[in-house]
């Protein structure tokens, strides 16, 4: 870690320090802090000149923190909206996974010997106790919050807020105010696309995390803290960028296999303690209100909020990186609004990482033919082309005991050897002439000698005699004379690569050197000439055990830890030496094969109406043969029905006991319902529509009561849930995509 150093004027500084670094006074915050610059308003007005003066300092540490000039009392225009009054237009929820363990780093550096620091005003967060008025109390509270954050990160969902309200101008920096008018958005290093003429603010709550991200090699990023709680920021300089990428690939092997640029997804966080333990230089700082953090090209940085906070972010090109363009001021430096999403600056496709290097694959797919025989389409030889059409004929390969035809994977040396065994007139002198200038020694047998043991023995004998070496080829004879009888399908072919995977490890390719059927394993030559014995169960073929494994083997059921929560805070996490890792924990509905289902609201429909509709469809009646029913007759019939039903249920009857009263009541209600339905059917059979409506209005018993509606709705058959399947990719796209694409709701069927 860097010690606390304060550089003086160029004449008094070390010779290794450039004079550009010393023109502006700065100091280092703590043992692992970044430079803090407190410029005057005259030094900060011209942003382009300011960046030039601190360029080497920023490249060394990766970022610098700029404190608001003391002469600027109100940095924002009073006519515009204050940051505290801004309402977020969109809130997103997402999970951030942690890779690596977090532990406290004990520093042996004496903080008392640090260089002098200029006094600054400490803004104590509202979340901390009110008695934390001194800087020491503030730092202690921040340290406790950071430790609690890393211990409980994977147990909470994080919230992110965005708004498209009019931007707040930096009127005290004229160069930035002028540059904001252009709003040029750098997408895939294209200088034509234009950013919408609106501002973008970012809001976060407690534990809202900005995972590790990196800017374009030509871009500077400025993070402006508009108000609210502080943010903890981590910075990795560009000099350690490659080391960080390699370490990230080792810690997150699954994500690295799915996409080699998985860091651009911004869904994995690596604790700084793990990085420091592996030799990655990591700086940290606490960004407070009215402070700016400027990151330089190639710098990886990450942050999380210690409370409610509002940020503003924009990026611009470096004057020296844009050598092909003549930029006279910062307005032409392509200042643009930029969200906390790498997709806006780093569009990429999700392609799995190549398991073997290009050199390793070229060993299989490239010919050792002269340049004149290589086609113009590329270095790869056509699959169906033969090496020498004159020396081979199709009739030589009709019988099962004959030598297999030459393969495009065979070299000239292998093809010549095969031709020697097919031709009866070729002499040893002609054969020796074929090996002139041959420097490459084959480690495996030619493909033409796989199923012909006699030719194989002759080939090994000739190889030892002509090369004069003691290359030991295995004398293993295949047990299966036919490929169809081999346990693996398709059967292994010597010299060809096959995919393999041990347990839940990474997928790798290996060239088949031997097929040990008696031991049920293959001898594979992997990258860097490593020879590995792989059982048949680990070969990824359609007939192997690995090919028949269920999805649960690769996505096992995870057990949630027994953690007690009190108002959302785990209270017994101290009982564990370390919290169990929940990095791969996802909701059951988001697992593959279990799509998200949406059940629409059920419309309640009375059973009586459905019964009437069924009767009308099953027994149609003609309105010509049926005479209209007078209204008076209907009323009389209804009164007689009610009187009849009242006489049925007699409480004085000894048969109607306390236990049998409910059965009698059910039967009476059923009879009443049947009579009512018959009356309704007669009403609907009337030919005159006006008479029918009149009858319905006058008949009170025809209209079902509220109790009838509730009983009928309870007996309805529920419809099957409509499957609005949303894949896991769509879910991740919704929670992590940039704001300008979120407005396109065609990506989310459930939100249309």
Swiss-Prot record:
One of its GO terms (molecular function) is histone H3K36 demethylase activity. PROSITE patterns: JMJC, JMJN. Residues 391-438 are annotated as: Disordered. InterPro entries: JmjC_dom, JmjN. It is found in: Nucleus. Residues 34-75 form the JmjN domain. Keywords: Nucleus, Transcription, Transcription regulation. PANTHER family: [HISTONE H3]-TRIMETHYL-L-LYSINE(9) DEMETHYLASE, LYSINE-SPECIFIC DEMETHYLASE. This is Lid2 complex component jmj3. The keyword Transcription regulation applies. Residues 162-333 form the JmjC domain. One of its GO terms (biological process) is chromatin remodeling. It comes from Schizosaccharomyces pombe (strain 972 / ATCC 24843) (Fission yeast). Residues 427-438 have a biased composition (Basic and acidic residues). Component of the Lid2 complex composed of ash2, jmj3, lid2, sdc1 and snt2.
């Amino acid at each position: 870690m860097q010690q606390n150093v304060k550089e003086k004027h160029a004449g008094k500084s070390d010779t290794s320090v450039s004079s550009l670094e010393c023109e502006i006074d700065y100091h280092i915050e703590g043992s692992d802090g970044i430079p803090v610059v407190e410029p005057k308003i005259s030094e900060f007005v011209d942003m382009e000149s300011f960046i030039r003066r601190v360029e080497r300092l920023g490249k060394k540490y990766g970022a610098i923190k700029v404190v608001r000039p003391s002469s600027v009392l109100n940095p924002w225009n009073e006519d515009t909206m204050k940051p505290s009054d801004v309402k977020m237009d969109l809130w997103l929820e997402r999970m951030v996974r942690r890779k690596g363990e977090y532990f406290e780093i004990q520093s042996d550096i004496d903080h008392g010997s640090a260089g002098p620091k200029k006094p600054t005003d400490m803004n104590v967060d509202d979340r901390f106790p009110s008695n934390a008025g001194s800087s020491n109390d503030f730092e202690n509270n921040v340290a406790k919050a950071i430790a609690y954050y890393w211990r409980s990160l994977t147990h909470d969902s994080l919230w992110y807020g965005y708004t498209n309200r009019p931007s707040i101008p930096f009127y005290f920096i004229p160069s930035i105010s002028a540059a904001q008018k252009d709003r040029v958005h750098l997408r895939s290093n294209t200088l034509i696309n234009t950013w919408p003429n609106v501002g973008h603010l970012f809001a976060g709550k407690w534990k809202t995390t900005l995972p590790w991200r990196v800017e374009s090699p030509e871009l500077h990023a400025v993070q402006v803290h508009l108000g609210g709680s502080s943010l903890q920021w981590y910075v990795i300089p560009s000099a350690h960028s490659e080391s960080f990428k390699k370490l990230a690939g080792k810690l997150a092997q699954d994500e690295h296999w799915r996409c080699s640029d998985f860091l651009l997804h911004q869904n994995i966080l690596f604790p700084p303690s793990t990085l420091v333990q592996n030799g990655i230089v990591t700086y940290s700082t606490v960004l407070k209100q009215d402070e700016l953090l400027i990151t330089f090209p190639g710098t990886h940085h990450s942050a999380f909020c210690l409370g409610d906070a509002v940020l503003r972010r924009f990026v611009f090109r470096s004057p020296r990186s844009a050598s092909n363009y003549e930029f006279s001021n910062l307005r032409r430096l392509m200042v643009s609004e930029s969200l906390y999403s790498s997709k806006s600056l780093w569009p990429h496709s999700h392609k799995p990482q190549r398991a073997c290097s290009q050199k390793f694959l070229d060993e299989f797919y490239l010919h050792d033919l002269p340049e004149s025989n290589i086609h113009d389409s590329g270095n790869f030889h056509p699959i169906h082309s033969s090496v020498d059409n004159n020396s081979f004929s199709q009739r030589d390969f009709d019988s099962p005991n004959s030598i297999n035809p030459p393969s495009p994977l065979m070299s000239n040396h292998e093809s010549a050897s095969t031709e020697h065994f097919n031709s009866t007139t070729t002499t040893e002198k002609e054969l020796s002439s074929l090996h002139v200038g041959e420097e490459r020694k084959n480690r495996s047998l030619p493909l033409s000698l796989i199923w012909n043991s006699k030719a194989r023995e002759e080939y090994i004998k000739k190889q030892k005699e002509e090369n004069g070496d003691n290359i030991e080829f295995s004398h293993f004879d295949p047990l299966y004379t036919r490929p169809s009888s081999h346990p693996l399908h398709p059967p292994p072919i010597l010299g060809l690569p096959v995919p393999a995977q041990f347990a839940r490890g990474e997928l790798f390719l290996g060239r088949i050197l031997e097929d040990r059927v008696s031991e049920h394993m293959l001898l594979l030559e992997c990258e860097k000439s490593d020879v590995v014995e792989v059982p048949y169960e680990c070969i990824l073929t359609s007939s192997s055990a690995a090919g028949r494994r269920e999805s649960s083997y690769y996505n096992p059921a995870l057990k949630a830890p027994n953690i007690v929560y009190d108002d959302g805070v785990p209270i017994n996490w101290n009982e564990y030496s370390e919290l169990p890792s929940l990095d791969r924990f996802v909701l059951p509905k988001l697992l593959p094969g279990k799509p998200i289902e949406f059940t629409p609201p059920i419309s309640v429909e009375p059973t009586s109406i459905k019964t009437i509709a069924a009767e009308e469809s099953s027994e149609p009646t003609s309105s010509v043969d049926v005479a209209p029913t007078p209204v008076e007759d209907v009323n009389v019939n209804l009164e007689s029905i009610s009187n009849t039903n009242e006489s049925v249920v007699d409480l004085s009857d000894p048969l109607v006991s306390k236990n049998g009263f409910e059965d009698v009541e059910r039967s009476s209600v059923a009879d009443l319902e049947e009579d009512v339905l018959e009356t309704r059917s007669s009403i609907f059979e009337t030919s005159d529509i006006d008479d029918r409506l009149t009858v319905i209005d006058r008949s009170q018993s025809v209209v079902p009561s509220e109790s009838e509606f509730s009983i009928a709705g309870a007996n309805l058959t529920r419809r099957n849930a409509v499957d609005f399947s949303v894949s896991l990719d769509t879910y991740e796209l919704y929670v992590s995509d940039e704001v300008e694409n979120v407005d396109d709701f065609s990506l989310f069927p459930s939100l249309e």
